[in-house]
Amino acid sequence: MLKLTKKADYGLIALKHLAVHQAGVPATVRSCSAKDIAESYGIPLPLLSKILQKLAKAGFLRSEHGTNGGYLLARDPRDITALEVIRLIDGPIFLTSCFTEHGMCSHSERCSVREPLRKVHEGILRLLSNITILDMTHDDPAPAGIPPEQLYELGGGLIAPGLRNKTI
C-alpha cells in the first residue's frame, strides 16, 4: 500500500503550521520553535527537530537563533509542493518495483498491468506536485480544494468516469 511515512507527514504538518503562523502574525514574531510545533500536534520533539533540520538544510526553512528564535519558511508556501517535501524526507516514490531506479522485476516481460500502473504512478506524482503548502492551509474537504473533475485531469484520467461528478 502506498503510504506516507510519519516523518513525511510530520514534515508537511510543520510546513503547514509555519505557513499559517507566518500569515497571521507581525514579521517580528514569525518564527516558531520546534517545541511549539511538536506540542501543538503531539509530535515527538527529537523526531520533529531532525525533520526541521533536514527541511532547513534543503532550503525550505530558515532557522533563527536567540530568545525569539525558531523556524521560518524560507520559500513562499505557494512554491513548496507536497511532492518535493515527501521526496526530501522519504526519498523517491515508487508505486511498484516496475518504477524503481532499476525499473525491472521478474515479471517485466509478461506483465499485463505495467502500463496501467505506470499511469497510476504518474498520476500520483502529478497530483502531489500540484498540491502546495499554501493549498494545505485551506480547510477544504476536497484535497487542496481541487474539484473532482480537476483531480481527474491532474491524475491523468485516473478517476473512474462515474466518480468525476461526485464529491471525493
Task: Give residue ranges: language-model regions.
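Residue cluster at the C-terminal edge of the helix-turn-helix DNA-binding motif
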Residues: 57-60, 88
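Alpha-helical residues within the helix-turn-helix
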Residues: 39, 56-57
